Amino acid sequence: MKKCIISMLALAFAISANAQEKGDDMQPLPHKIENLELLDLRKNITKIPFYGEKNILIFYVDPDKYKQNHEFTVEMEENHRAAGENIEGLGIKKQKNTIFPNAIVRSIARKRTEKNNATIIADPDCIVAKEWGLGDCNNYFVLMIVTKEGELVYCKKGELTKEEQAEFYEVVDKYR
């Protein structure tokens, strides 16, 4: 009996440790967040644009997984479903764990801003994930909504299913 209980406790501990390793430690939503100092595409320190002024739709992108949700984001851009006078969108590129040199990633981001007037800033040390309680964001495209009151109300990591895309549109409609 003792061996069975010890085995069960060891298994529970291993499962818990494995969940923490995989980054399953995201804070529950909604929760308050702070504006952070990141870098613009010229490596100058900048705060997150529009924070406290408007609701913000944030694309927190791992350059290694930039194709996650590609069709969805193109569709969103073309149909303007996430656009409105009360919301602004911006991209934050994670730099810490990418296989690509930062200069190349910055160059690609600058070209994108020239093409569609996007706002893109850089997170060189995964500060956003740490400070905002997002858990592990490595190898994920993360879609977030931050209210103008500084509250993170929506956060999804990875490839969104059709159901999650529909859920996103329901949420973003409240903040447009």
Give short role names for the model-derived ranges:
Residues 4-13:
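Sec-dependent N-terminal signal peptides
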Residues 36-55:
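A short beta-strand-turn-helix
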